[in-house]
Amino acid sequence: MSPGLLETNDYPTALRTFEWKALWELVDGTAERLNLAHECVDRHPPEAVALRIQKADGGREIHTFGALAAWSSRFAHWLEAQGVARGDRVAIMLDPSLAFYGALFGAVRRGAIAVPLFTLFGPDGLALRIDDCSPKILLVDREAERRQAEFPAVRVLAVDGSFEAALAEQPAEYAPATAADDLAVFQYTSGTTRALPEAVR
């Protein structure tokens, strides 16, 4: 019987006694039913701090796990209402914020694939990634009309006051139905050594 992963204090022991099946000790889910949004967000006390965000203008934001769980659950409900199915890609081109992390975990909660995109990508870099992942929805902070013209096959939405109001009408809890082998995130590499950056899945 190997020691629990959280009870091992040194690397040699952890390496010697490691078993893949022991990883299931660390999560609530099973191979048949596992959701990363639940594991990363819902398991924490709702009043505990989840996000500390330093803004470019010097401002700061602090958000709890409860707020993150509610935002992501409402977004998952909204995605379902918009016809976003399991395996569909949802591109998220937002500055660090509750909306960014809420959308990321909300897409995962729904069973869609979250695709975080850097807000300072130029036209060519963004087009390469959009063409590669073929998202059903692209969330942006601003310039939604221009992005829509650039990518007519993608539904482009600005996360603004009206969008937040629409989310507020959705329930604050969502029961995910995903498995351990479902894809959750496409994270594009920097692409410095190849024309098209590779999506780590």
PLM regions and their residue ranges:
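N-lobe entry segment of adenylate-forming
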Residues: M1-H63, A67-E80, A153, A177
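Structural core segment of the AMP-binding/adenylate-forming
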Residues: P3, A81, F105-A168, E173-T178
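Conserved AMP-binding/adenylate-forming core of the ANL superfamily
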Residues: E47, L51-F105, G122-A127, R201
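Conserved pre-ATP/AMP-binding loop-to-beta segment of ANL
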Residues: E47-V49, A158, Q170-A195
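Short coil/turn motifs that cap or connect alpha-helices
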Residues: T64, A85, I113, A195-L196
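Surface-exposed loop/turn positions
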Residues: D88, A112, D181-D182
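Conserved S/T- and glycine-rich ATP-binding loop of Class I adenylate-forming
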Residues: V90, A107, L138, L183, ...
